[in-house]
Amino acid sequence: MKAAITATAKYLPQSVLSNHDLEQMLETNDEWIRSRTGIGERRIMNDPSKATAYMCGEVALQLLEARKMKPEEIEVIIVATMTPDMLFPATACFVQGIIGATNAWAFDINAACSGFLFALSTASRLIESGAHKKVMVIGGDKMSSVIDYTNRSTAILFGDGAAGVILEPSTNDNYGILDARLYSDGASGTSHLLMAAGGSLNPATHETVDKRMHFLHQDGKQVFKSAVTSMADVAAEIMTRNNLSAEDISFLVPHQANQRIINATAERMGLDQEKVYSNVARYGNTTAGTIPICLAELNEQEQLKTGSNLVLVSFGAGYTWGGIYIKWQ
């Protein structure tokens, strides 16, 4: 038994933060940002009363509507996020409450930008085992809550957003999620992309706030190098393991870190740009939200046909990275 995606949905805040807006806040300009990242604008959740759980809840409600499913039918809810509303309870529990999924059990996965792929793979195993038949998987982040908007190197990259899918048993074992390769490197990856404070090691104090330790920190050059290598390697591995040529692939759906990383991954796979889905110019990096937002847009645009071969690849803090092969049902 394989797991197949039977519904997609996305939520993006209405407020837009453009490169021209950032010019008023930082020593930067539109050309500089576009040439280095490919990003033109990003969405920001400006309402301080709404955060990741709200966005994921909106996605969950849309998923139920798209599948014409009652909330009581959902058996498991998995939310991938690195910006939970609170350290506990889990964001997934808030989502469960929002939609009234009284029969579900719910938990979060934090694998940063790789979170959605880690959650999707976990959910597919729950389906394949026969333990569950209706699993909701959502990736979302309110990155604006952890970004230092006085830091040019990170302020330009990130946006807010969420998206997700419903997984159910495939009607044919030749379709659905057919392969997944997931990796972590805690030996060398933990110091290059992180938020140092807010956990049990550095709980909030006046000192941690003054030192700006509650914002995302990134060693940009090292992360770029590692992301290009890791995403390209895992994409090549997925292709080799499943005897896929560049011609066989309908779409590469990469994590939307920046356009240069996306282009380098596609080049390694030998893919033409028309087979590479990218919306980083419009939304920036929404971390756990990037890949499911892409899937939702592809589905909305009716570009996904029965038998379409999709390769999903990601890279994130930890380091974490992975690839998933889906034959669309």
Swiss-Prot record:
Keywords: Acyltransferase, Cytoplasm, Fatty acid biosynthesis, Fatty acid metabolism, Lipid biosynthesis, Lipid metabolism, Multifunctional enzyme, Transferase. SUPFAM superfamilies: Thiolase-like. Its main location: cytoplasm. CDD domains: KAS_III (cd00830). It catalyses: malonyl-[ACP] + acetyl-CoA + H(+) = 3-oxobutanoyl-[ACP] + CO2 + CoA. GO terms for biological process: fatty acid biosynthetic process; secondary metabolite biosynthetic process. Transmembrane segments: none annotated. Signal peptide: none annotated. It is an enzyme of class 2 (transferase). The gene is fabH. It holds the Pfam family ACP_syn_III. Catalyzes the condensation reaction of fatty acid synthesis by the addition to an acyl acceptor of two carbons from malonyl-ACP. Catalyzes the first condensation reaction which initiates fatty acid synthesis and may therefore play a role in governing the total rate of fatty acid production. Possesses both acetoacetyl-ACP synthase and acetyl transacylase activities. Its substrate specificity determines the biosynthesis of branched-chain and/or straight-chain of fatty acids. The last Arg residue of the ACP-binding site is essential for the weak association between ACP/AcpP and FabH. Residues 256-260 are annotated as: ACP-binding. Pathway: Lipid metabolism; fatty acid biosynthesis. Homodimer. GO terms for molecular function: 3-oxoacyl-[acyl-carrier-protein] synthase activity; beta-ketoacyl-acyl-carrier-protein synthase III activity. GO terms for cellular component: cytoplasm. The lineage of its organism: Bacteria, Pseudomonadati, Chlorobiota, Chlorobiia, Chlorobiales. It is found in: Cytoplasm. Its EC number is 2.3.1.180. The keyword S-adenosyl-L-methionine does not apply. This is Beta-ketoacyl-[acyl-carrier-protein] synthase III. It comes from the Bacteria.
